[in-house]
C-alpha cells in the first residue's frame, strides 16, 4: 500500500484532460503519455499480453497462479479527466488527520467546506487529498488506476490465489468515446468491474439512459427599425423552446432515480442559434418519452415560420442503462458485495447519475458494474479523495480476485 499514494500523485501530475468534438481517439496527446507510462509499469511488473491499441486502449494480463477452470475477470479505469475543468499543473494538497471545518484550497479564497459538502463530517481523522483550488484533482479516474495497479502488486507480492486477471485502461471516457473502440474479444474476460465510482461502499450497476439533442435554429435578421413582420429572431425562438422544457426536471432539481433535461449550451445571434441539451432517465420508456417531448417542443415553436426560417433537431442516443445486462449475471454483484463485507465495508447499491465505460461494455457482451474509488466532487476544483478510501478499494479488488478463484 505504501506506493498507492505515490502512484496516484504521479498519475495526476500528467494533464490528460479529454476534448469533446474531436474525431481522433484519444482526443488529446496527454492521454498517450499516461498510457505509455502505464504500459511501461505493467511490463516492469511482469504482466503478460501487454498491448496498446492505435485507439489508446491499454490491456494486460496477470496470469493465474492456481490451476483449474477459474473465470477470467477484468478491472478497468479511464486515463482522461473531464473537459469541464482544467487538469493542467495539478497541485495536490495532502491533509492528514482531517479534524473538521473548512480546508483552504491553495492561497486564494477557495475552500472545501462541510457546509457545502456534508460528507466531510464522515471523514474525520482521515487523510484527504485535495486540489489547490485552481484545477480538478483527477481522482476521476486516476484514483481507480492507482488502485488497480496497487492491487496487482499486492496479488503478486502476497501470492494471493487468483485466476487470470485482465486489466484495461481506456481513453476519452469523459467524452463518451472510450468504450467504442474496446475489443471485448481481445480482453477475453467473463465479466469485469470499472473502478470509477465515488465514496467507499458504492457499487453501481444502474446508470442513465442518455441522449444528446442538438437544435439548430435559423432566423432572419433585418434592421430592428424596419423589422415588423420580417425579422425572425433565432434567439427568441431558442428562449421559447427552453421555456417549454419542464423547469422542475433539470439536473439541479432532481436526484436519485429522477431523470432530467439539461440545457448544456446555447449560443447565437438573431440570424442563427444553436442549443445543446442532454437527456437522462433510468427508465427506458420515460427516456423515449423525453425524446418525443423535445421533438414536440421543436415542432410547436417552429410552427408557422417562413420557409427560409426553420428549427432542425437531431437526437443521438449516447448509452443505455446497463441494469438489464448486469442482472442477468447476479453472481457478479454477489461477489463484489461479499468482497466489501469481507473488508468491513457495507455495500451501498446506488444508481449512477451519469455513465461509465461499463455501461457501453455491458451492451457489448462484457457485464461490467462499477466499484468505488474513494473520491468525491468530481469534475471540479472541490474534488478530493481519501487515502483510506483508496486503500479500501485496493482491498476490495484483491478480495474480488480471491473470491473468484474459489468459484471453480
From Swiss-Prot:
Binding, Zn(2+) 1: 78, 140, 196
Some GO term, biological process aspect, for this entry: which one?
Answer: proteolysis
What does the record say about how the cofactor binds?
A: Binds 2 Zn(2+) ions per subunit.
Molecular function terms, GO-annotated: metallopeptidase activity; tripeptide aminopeptidase activity; zinc ion binding
Q: What are the binding positions for Zn(2+) 2 in this chain? A: 140, 174, 379
Give me the Gene Ontology terms describing cellular component: cytosol
User: Which residues does the entry assign to the active site, renumbered to this chain?
Assistant: 80, 173 (proton acceptor)
What InterPro entries has UniProt attached to this entry? ArgE/DapE_CS, Bact_exopeptidase_dim_dom, Peptidase_M20, Peptidase_M20_dimer, Peptidase_M20B
Instruction: List the cofactors.
Output: Zn(2+)
Instruction: List the EC numbers from the record.
Output: 3.4.11.4
Q: Which domain of life is it from?
A: Bacteria
- Main function: Cleaves the N-terminal amino acid of tripeptides.
Name the protein family: Belongs to the peptidase M20B family.
Task: List the protein's name.
Answer: Peptidase T
Source species, please?
Escherichia coli O1:K1 / APEC
Amino acid at each position: 500500500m505504501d506506493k498507492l499514494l505515490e502512484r496516484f500523485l504521479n498519475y495526476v501530475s500528467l494533464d490528460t484532460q479529454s476534448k469533446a468534438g474531436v474525431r481522433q481517439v484519444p482526443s488529446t496527446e496527454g492521454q498517450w503519455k499516461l498510457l505509455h507510462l502505464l504500459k511501461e509499469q505493467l511490463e516492469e511488473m511482469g504482466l503478460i499480453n501487454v498491448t496498446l491499441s492505435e485507439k489508446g486502449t491499454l490491456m494486460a494480463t496477470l496470469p493465474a497462479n492456481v490451476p483449474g477452470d477459474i473465470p477470467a475477470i477484468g478491472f478497468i479505469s479511464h486515463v482522461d479527466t473531464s473537459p469541464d475543468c482544467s487538469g493542467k499543473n495539478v497541485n495536490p494538497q495532502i491533509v492528514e488527520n482531517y479534524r473538521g471545518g473548512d480546508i483552504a484550497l491553495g492561497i486564494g479564497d477557495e475552500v472545501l467546506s462541510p457546509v457545502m459538502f456534508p460528507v466531510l463530517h464522515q471523514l474525520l481523522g482521515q487523510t484527504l487529498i485535495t486540489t489547490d483550488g485552481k484545477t480538478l484533482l483527477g481522482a476521476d479516474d486516476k484514483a481507480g488506476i492507482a488502485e488497480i495497479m496497487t492491487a496487482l502488486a499486492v496479488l503478486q507480492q502476497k501470492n494471493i490465489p487468483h485466476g487470470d486477471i485482465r486489466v484495461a485502461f481506456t481513453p476519452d471516457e469523459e467524452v463518451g468515446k472510450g468504450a467504442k473502440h474496446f475489443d471485448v474479444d481481445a480482453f477475453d474476460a467473463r465479466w469485469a468491474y470499472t473502478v470509477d465510482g465515488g465514496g467507499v461502499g458504492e457499487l453501481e450497476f444502474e446508470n442513465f439512459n442518455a441522449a444528446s439533442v442538438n437544435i439548430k435554429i435559423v432566423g432572419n435578421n433585418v434592421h430592428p427599425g424596419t423589422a415588423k413582420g420580417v425579422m425572425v429572431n433565432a434567439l427568441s425562438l431558442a428562449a421559447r423552446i427552453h421555456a417549454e422544457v419542464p423547469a422542475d426536471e433539470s439536473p439541479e432539481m432532481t436526484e436519485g432515480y429522477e431523470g432530467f433535461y439539461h440545457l448544456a449550451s446555447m449560443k447565437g445571434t438573431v440570424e442563427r442559434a444553436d442549443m445543446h441539451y442532454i437527456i437522462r432517465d433510468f427508465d427506458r420508456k420515460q427516456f423515449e418519452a423525453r425524446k418525443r417531448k423535445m421533438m414536440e417542443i421543436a415542432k410547436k415553436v417552429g410552427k408557422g415560420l417562413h420557409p427560409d426560417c426553420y428549427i432542425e433537431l437531431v437526437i443521438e442516443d449516447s448509452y443505455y442503462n446497463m441494469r438489464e445486462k448486469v442482472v442477468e449475471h447476479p453472481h457478479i454483484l454477489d461477489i463484489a458485495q461479499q468482497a466489501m463485507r469481507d473488508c468491513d465495508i457495507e455495500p451501498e447499491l446506488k444508481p449512477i447519475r451519469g455513465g461509465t465505460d461499463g455501461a457501453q461494455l455491458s451492451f457489448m457482451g462484457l457485464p461490467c458494474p462499477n466499484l468505488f474509488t474513494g473520491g468525491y466532487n468530481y469534475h471540479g476544483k472541490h474534488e478530493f479523495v481519501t487515502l483510506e478510501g483508496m486503500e479500501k478499494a485496493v482491498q476490495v479488488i484483491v478480495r474480488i480476485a480471491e473470491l473468484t478463484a474459489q468459484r471453480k
